[in-house]
């Protein structure tokens, strides 16, 4: 057997020469050229080595050579007839080992050479083929060769795994791709235990999961463990979870135990679990929103469905014919307007030209759609019948006076086409499927907007500005509210228009914008995904069509009951709704509450909305300002999508007596119809992705100035009858404002907005409007001039607008100072989140102290705070921050009259009165002390654990000029030396001992004591310490005389065995208080021979070996300069106390750095015991050891100081007395519990000032070797 062992070793090491020498007596089959074998040769073969000999593991020389990659040895062995089909003790063949190694050459040799060829589908004892071995370890070339040799990739091992399963499990991306390419059917060969997707998701192989999903593997494939989401969530693979969610996985799939992925995460609470649960929760909420989007809105508040959700209707041939006819008629009109412009025709001639064409176009509009065509196009879209328009509305609209192209010709600052339809076509068009709700040119009648616009007189409009800026750009919204919607249809039918006539150039440009919208604007329209919530008429169906960049907007709200009485509008009504893409689930109950709060009947809510959007051109930005005066009636603030706006009021515009009389006559003879027009125009829109837009539509909000005029005693005669008053507005007179002034105005608006959302207050509108007229009852002469010379008039208007624009910037700055920011209504955090569509984060905010919207301004809540409390979605955080910027900022102390005189008053102003007792108990008894507080004191001293409350307190304190925070080494504290009592004062007792009835603590008594201390020392606040410990030192310093300061040696000088240069705590912490640590107490061991750290190491090793055999208690180690107290962690009872003088050594266990021990001496028996503890982590054990060393150093320096002062041993601290104050624990954890409280009449020399060497605090966890060496010897204290 010796030679066989040599052969096996030679094959293992690759010694080809030795292999050939050992096998030379055996004639190779492949090398034989002779036909017959002589007898000596046969005898030699009989006596020769067996080439297939095996060792103890069943390996043949070919196994060894294949496993170790010796190609030449493999060839030599095969030449000497080595068999490739001999298995080892585990059933593995040489091919398995070569595939496991990934040696392609040897795999090919084993398959194609030798007397016997390897069988590629051979399985070992675990049912694994060579393909399993190669796939598991990612040997893609071996996999390719085996696949070419027709290896079966569907074979499973004993665990039911295919090669694809193993490749996915271990993230072998290239192998996965090869297997999927060669055998796509492998994805369907799954078991109930696992799939490749589950295995890849479990181990977090992001790329592998992505490849499997790209290969059309079903993302919702289930096993007994649930979906792949279950696996990824359970094993904390956040990126894979996100990938699966992005792929549309069903998060509601349950495993065999009926648990969803969220249920599993709740069973494993950890930070990673919370983060993954937040991702899944956000996904489920958004998925629910997408799934129920149209259904919920159709059920609760019918609005038009998005354009992309349905196919565009195909116009019928009759419609095309009508469209062509209208196109021809409009072309003629444009040509004649050009001729009028070239000839400089008068305004009257231009009106005649327009009127003649408007009548012909009106005929096309009246017969635009037959009933059958309507059913085939618009009605087919929403499948809801259109309610018939009330006869009163039809009659009113047919008697609306002379027609004219005012809406198209009036230079209304970008409003392309304003007006009304003449019949119920207006209501029917509201069912258009587009988001901006008007059909494009290839649907129905593209020119209806012009046909209806030329048949109506212009409406008196009130215009105000409000801006909304999405993240992807800025645009300005100008609200245009119909001032006559409350007049019940009493339009003035005089021929004189309310606004000055435009020039032919302006009229031509406006008409061209209507009928020839820019292609770029069409793209912007189709790409926007705004969701506009229309108001409802009395029948509950929407009757609004908003427009965008060239498309018309109509809205009618026929009345269903008598006009609103003045009593019902005592406080006004203001609602401003705009739905963002993720806020579609706002509750109807909130809407009803808002209506109830505004004292407006619900059925009339739609009549009080008059939204007006930004009428602004993308190429020439400018603004409109209405003539608005602030009203005296209070009004609730408005909700506007993602932000809150200040209330706006529209007071009545007085008219002359003749106008009022004419209006009164009309009211007596005409039926009263209330209607409104809503114009929506968007500016500078870009493509917006779902979930990233911020309120791109201007919501509807009620102006209702006419109704309020009667409530407050309007002066017009018309008020006495109906309570409604008409107003006039020179719509469009701002068009010629110099562009430089307008650009300056816009730049100021946007540059001063932290939140990119600008809300203009009514005061600004009042001031802007008042500059355009000398008095409320008079208009300047230029307003009423009607001259044929348009150039002269517009030049005069330019001068007026220039004078107005010159002071806009300064006015806005002044107003901004008076009104620092929009105020928010009194509402809960849940309501506020509901308004911005992120109600799912209510618990996140409330549980972390962000529980009051009045104290959640931008100086309190930051992006990092939102991230820390678990809001991981960056888009949601940005939306929250944008809404937070509109909340009121917390006013710092001393700002704007905010000067609280006491701590209690200050905390009550922050609605944090519950912390008053904690502040006073810990010495913060005045605002002077509070102003110097740091966040670390809020956490460690005051125990304010809620980050929202801490941020609220710090924001209230404002930007303070402080020294370095207290966590750094403090400055040298020079305490005064008042004369008087030479006896050192007592140490400050613990709070529970000093105030036994802390639950009913007299707060006023504490304040009186603090005041008395201040009266005893007039210089109390000259050098007020920053921390509670320093304040206690200041209190002690007023009662005794001190010796010279002392200096603590750094750790590396106090003992040579540690390289640490800085202590862990400030010395006063160990004198006036204690450092408390929780740890597991493993027990104690009798130390027969004191050998320093070797004794602690032995005890740690022994305790570790037995810690599994008993119940390990949790204790609190309270370390001070006196020693270490054992405190039961459950009931907080003091079990025992080890004096500092009796502790001789403390060290960490070199084998387990989280285990540490220290040796104490029992004075009664004079025996030493080693007490062993296990900390929760290595860093904590390191800190405890270092704190013990610092406690010894403080006690040592205090003892030296006492000896130098001449007090002798009688004045040494209590820890150096001869008798122990507490029993010492017995060996092996037999600890006696004692309820005896420590004596409070102890004498000590803790009342000594000191100077700490400047430097940084010790750094933890940096070097485990340093930690192991961070033990401290406590010797010499007994020799003093």
UniProtKB/Swiss-Prot annotation:
Biased composition (Basic and acidic residues): 482-491
Keywords of the record: ANK repeat, Cytoplasm, Repeat
Ranges for the ANK repeats: 2-31, 57-86, 90-119, 126-155, 159-188, 192-221, 224-253
Region (Disordered), start-end ranges: 299-322, 361-399, 479-573, 704-723, 755-791, 960-994, 1208-1243
Transmembrane helix is among the record's keywords: no
Residue ranges annotated for the SAM domain, each copy included: 824-890, 898-963
GO process terms (BP): ephrin receptor signaling pathway
Record-annotated PID domain positions: 1071-1223
Location(s), subcellular: Cytoplasm
SMART domains, sorted: ANK (SM00248), PTB (SM00462), SAM (SM00454)
InterPro entries, sorted: ANKS1/Caskin, Ankyrin_rpt, Ankyrin_rpt-contain_sf, PH-like_dom_sf, PTB/PI_dom, SAM, SAM/pointed_sf, SAM_ANKS1_repeat1
Compositionally biased spans, kind Polar residues: 520-550, 707-723, 770-782, 980-994
MF-aspect GO terms: ephrin receptor binding
Keyword Cytoplasm recorded: yes
One Gene Ontology cellular component annotation held by this UniProt entry: cytosol
Name listed for the protein in its UniProt record: Ankyrin repeat and sterile alpha motif domain-containing protein 1B
Organism (species): Danio rerio (Zebrafish)
